[in-house]
UniProtKB/Swiss-Prot annotation:
Keywords: Antiport, Golgi apparatus, Membrane, Sugar transport, Transmembrane, Transmembrane helix, Transport. It is a multi-pass membrane protein. It comes from Arabidopsis thaliana (Mouse-ear cress). GO terms for cellular component: Golgi apparatus; Golgi membrane. Belongs to the TPT transporter family. TPT (TC 2.A.7.9) subfamily. This is UDP-rhamnose/UDP-galactose transporter 3. The gene is URGT3.
Length: 350
């Protein structure tokens, strides 16, 4: 029992480390990008190209890691990597277009709807089923985050189509991260090292055009200052940790868990926005955050309950199996003893 606890402890610590890295880096990158892109900051309104910079630095880190032997490179078919990169890039572009064409309220609803979509897609693709407790906790989280983020909700045809594409592609991308790691027995960082160069190249080629359609500005005409350049470097550095931790979390847990616990970032962003940027914090925001946190706690409890039930089921099957073997051995010994006694009795009678 002590040996099992020793084995579980490092795993639990590394799990918490992956979550902490993702939350801290995600919140940090949003704060850096807010300063970078806002009109009160550097007005660098080229989100898709910036994402290309993010993946370029991530690809460079992966290449250095492979060259120094820090990580091993495993084979993944090129068509799988290209397919994944297409899905991931469509997700990025569609999210940006959705934000541009829809109201902030509808954009937040579309992001929240990713949780049930991921659940349905995992059920269709991997025949995965969820307990009643998990379903309830997911609903509580969605309602809580919805209360504190959704304001005005306006829908138009183009925006609705972009939102649907964004939801589908983002959900599929997160499922693919986990399935590719399992399918090819490849680590999260190794997979990221293979997909990042493809994403970086394609986003840096297509990104300026997408950004022009979104903002009406060309990146080549932007007047780059030293402060803006430093914030781009900061954003890219945080993106490396954000990308690595995303792959780590989905590889260790599931796309649904990543979505649910990931909404802790929304709570952190609202709180930091209130502390650092004088954003308004209303009773509605606070109430929504409390409901969301309660939902996350219920989800953690429900997942632990599922794990315990799986372990108990395996233990029961193991006990049943061992009892059957013991009974067979006892029965066998009993038959042999009876036969020997019969032989002895036969000899006595003679």
């Amino acid at each position: 029992m002590a040996a099992e606890n020793e084995r579980k402890s490092p795993s639990a610590v590394s799990d918490m480390g992956a979550w902490a890295m993702n939350v801290i880096s995600s919140v940090g990158i949003i704060m850096a990008n807010k300063q970078l892109m806002s009109s009160s900051g550097f007005a660098f309104s080229f989100a898709t190209t910036l994402t290309g910079f993010h993946f370029a630095l991530t690809a460079l880190v992966g290449m250095v890691s492979n060259a120094t032997g820090f990580s091993a490179s495993k084979h993944v078919p090129m068509w799988e990597l290209i397919w994944f990169s297409i899905v991931a890039n469509v997700s990025i572009a569609a999210m940006n277009f959705s934000l541009m064409l829809n109201s902030v309220g509808f954009y937040q609803i579309s992001k929240l709807s990713m949780i049930p979509v991921v659940c349905v897609m995992e059920w269709i693709l991997h025949s995965k089923r969820y307990s009643r407790e998990v379903k309830i906790s997911v609903v509580v989280v969605v309602v809580g985050v919805g209360i504190c983020t959704v304001t005005d909700v306006k829908v138009n045809a183009k925006g609705f189509i972009c939102a649907c594409v964004a939801i589908f592609s983002s959900s599929l991308q997160q499922i693919l991260i986990g399935s590719l790691q399992k399918k090819y027995s490849i680590g999260s960082f190794e997979l990221l090292s293979k997909t990042a160069p493809i994403q970086a190249f394609s986003l840096l080629v297509v990104g300026p055009l997408v950004d022009y359609l979104l903002s009406g500005k060309f990146i080549m005409k932007y007047n780059m200052s030293s402060g803006c350049f430093l914030f781009i470097l900061l954003s890219c550095g945080l993106a490396v940790f954000c990308n690595i931790s995303q792959y780590l979390c989905i590889g260790r847990f599931s796309a649904v868990s990543f979505q649910v616990i990931g909404h802790m970032k929304t709570v952190c962003i609202l709180t930091l926005g209130w502390l650092l940027f004088d954003s308004a914090m209303t009773f509605k925001n606070v109430a929504g955050m409390i409901v969301a946190i309660v939902g996350m706690v219920i989800y953690s409890w429900a997942m632990e309950l599922e794990k315990q039930s799986i372990i108990a089921a395996k233990a029961l099957n193991s006990v049943k199996h061992s009892l059957t073997e013991e009974e067979f051995e006892l029965l066998k010994e009993g038959v042999e003893t009876t036969q020997s006694k019969d032989v002895e009795l036969g000899r006595t009678k003679d």
